[in-house]
Amino acid sequence: ALSDPNHRFVPFFGSSEWSRMDAMHPSVLAEAYNRGYTPYLLGQRGAASLTQYFGIQQIIPQMTKKQAVYVISPQWFVKKGANAAAFQSFFSNDQMVSFLRRQRGTSYDQYAAKRFLELYPESSLSQMMEKVAKGQELSKADRGQLKLRQKVLEKEDNFYSQFAVSSRNYDDKIAKKAVSLPKTFSYETLSNRADQLAAKATDNNPFRVSNNFFNTRLKGNYKALKGSQTK
């Protein structure tokens, strides 16, 4: 999609916020105000900075001298770093192959490889990652194996790209909300509109969190959570 000459997609890197398709979602705003691009959403719940870093390795050629938006989530900044289980669930062999083929042994490459091994030491190409982490060059045999894997992965991508994607989600979750926004773009007007929507959606609890979240996750047991994060 990022290489499409007939449509301008801008990658938006983030995590769980992309799944909340409210009226102020960047996809809705782009549709409502004809911004000349379509946000290409990258990331979901549990995705963190290291996940995004390896994901970017796959699209470096398409991103060169192009724009991108990177939304940083506060939950990424935790003492222990990224969650290993979450990282492994989002990581793909294609990302690893792309990284190993593009890396040049820089300090950035070495650090990324070390962090990868901390979170996914049993991966299929961990031996090559260990070489990068130590600043060693990959052998001719290593590069030949990576080239072969890349060809296999490209064939898989070509196969799955044949299947059409329904536009129903776009119509239901984006187009309908875009129509509800003011016709003229204004930060002040949209800010007031966001305040109104937020007040309505968080009016059944003292914490001002989503009514649905409170009803399904907190209402029955929130009193028992008192002091649970003080230690």
Regions found by a protein language model. Give the residues of each.
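Membrane-embedded segments
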Residues: 18-108
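Short loop/turn segments at strand-loop or loop-helix junctions that form parts
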Residues: 14-15, 70-75, 212-219
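Catalytic nucleophile-elbow at a beta strand-turn-alpha helix junction centered on a G-D-S/GDSL motif
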Residues: 7-23
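Secreted/periplasmic serine-hydrolase-like ester/acetyl group-modifying domain
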Residues: 99-231
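N-terminal hydrophobic targeting segments that direct proteins to the cell envelope
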Residues: 1-5
